[in-house]
Structures are given as C-alpha cells and as structure tokens.
C-alpha cells in the first residue's frame, strides 16, 4: 500500500502555508513537507488533527493505493 495525500491541495485552498498548518497541528514544517511528498506516514492522532485543521474527512485527505509490483 502506498499513501497519497491531498494535504498540499487542501492547504492551498484554505490559504495556509506549510508553517501555518504545522503550527495548527503541533508539528514542524518539515513534517508537513514530508507528508505532502508522501515520504511520511502520520500517526492516527496527527491525521485527525490535520482533518480538523483542513475541515475535511480522513478519506478526502489520505488515499491508500495498491503498489504496482511490476
């Protein structure tokens, strides 16, 4: 499974910088950057904080995809 996110898109829609979103959810800006690039899997607690900050559901923000094993 690969985790893809819509954090960057939804963050931009709300007019938030990475720094502002990071402050809202209690993490460093780099954590938001890694989440947006798909290089970090958030804890359930962090995922819930992000959903509240971006006013979206978990399945609107986080998309699980099957890996192509070719």
Predicted regions and their residues:
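A short, Lys/Arg-rich alpha-helix, primarily the initiator
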Residues: 1-13
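Residue-level signal for the short linker/turn that defines the boundary of a DNA-recognition helix
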Residues: 5, 15-16, 42-45
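Residue-level detection of the helix-turn-helix DNA-binding "recognition helix"
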Residues: 12, 26, 37, 66
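Alpha-helical residues within the helix-turn-helix
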Residues: 12, 23, 52
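Short alpha-helical DNA-recognition segment
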Residues: 16-34
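Short, charged recognition helix plus adjacent turn
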Residues: 63-70
């Amino acid at each position: 499974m690969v985790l893809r996110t819509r954090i960057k898109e939804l963050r931009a829609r709300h007019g938030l910088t990475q720094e502002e979103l990071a402050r809202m959810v209690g993490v460093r800006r780099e954590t938001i950057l890694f989440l947006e690039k798909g290089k970090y899997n958030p804890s359930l607690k962090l995922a819930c904080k992000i959903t509240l900050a971006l006013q979206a559901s978990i399945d609107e923000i986080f998309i699980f995809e099957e890996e192509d094993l070719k």
